[in-house]
Amino acid sequence: MEHKMFCYQCQETAGCSGCTQMGVCGKKPEVAAMQDLLVYVSKGLSAVTTQLRKEGTKVSEETNHLITWNLFTTITNANFDNEAIIARIHNTLSVRRTLILQVKDTSGLPEAAFWDIKTKDGSDASDDVLFAKAKEAGVLSTKDEDIRSLRELITYGLKGLSAYSKHANVLLSDDPEIDAFLQRALAATLDDSLTADDLVALTLETGNYGVRGMAMLDTANTGAYGNPEITRVNIGVGKNPGILVSGHDLKDLEMLLEQTQGTGVDVYTHSEMLPAHYYPAFKKYPNFVGNYGNAWWKQKEEFERFHGPILMTTNCIVPPKDSYKDRL
């Protein structure tokens, strides 16, 4: 059977070998293709930014955040909106066109640093061109299985690092050294001169930076909301109207709680937002009343039963049912 896609970035992948027709997470082949292409153009931009740093040129915070958010967009259960992903591809290419003009020596840059969707007359190529390139640039484009596995292991580690960084960035916490490493390592996955031993070393370095990224996020979270403490959480429901919040973005939760004060609207966490109850700063909100439901993978039935609005802050979403899509 012909592969419509190939994705094996999560532990629940089909047959423990890879989703090839549709993602177990609900991801469709066309979404998988555009995620692959977004990673590819992010690698190209990262090659440019890495070369700029070598030449002594500073890379802007906006560019760092763009690459970080691109990777975060492609992690499991984060974004199934193809139009939004394609928009990020266009934006990434636009930034790269500007930055590559600042590079003094482009001789060592990979093909991904030059690939573009602009035609000779300056217009954008059709979506068919995007999908054709995505097929060329996907996971299986690396033929050697060992090299492929190591490159993807590094990429998935960088995606995890991007998740930590993205959440820390929202709380105005940045580490330029993490950004520089993430981009250098991402660009290195295009370097055919690197051996398996080289990639193993880079994998270990990625792990070290992953720990550093977690520390940055922990410092950002505890600095803003205090140190988590043992807390009893209500798992029942009240009589007031309610809003359900899922994901990991504590800043989004804080903003919602501020906006709902005195309105008679209660706020409930779902799934991975449950730990928010442990932070002292959130205990001052009387309408932050408890947790509704269970794990993220039960959301289709639980969101259907919850009759209020649902706020998804980060990567916990599955393609929604029509019965509650308008409330999401």
Regions inferred by a protein language model and the residue ranges of each:
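Metallocofactor- and cofactor-centric catalytic cores in central/energy metabolism, strongly enriched
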Residues: 2-328
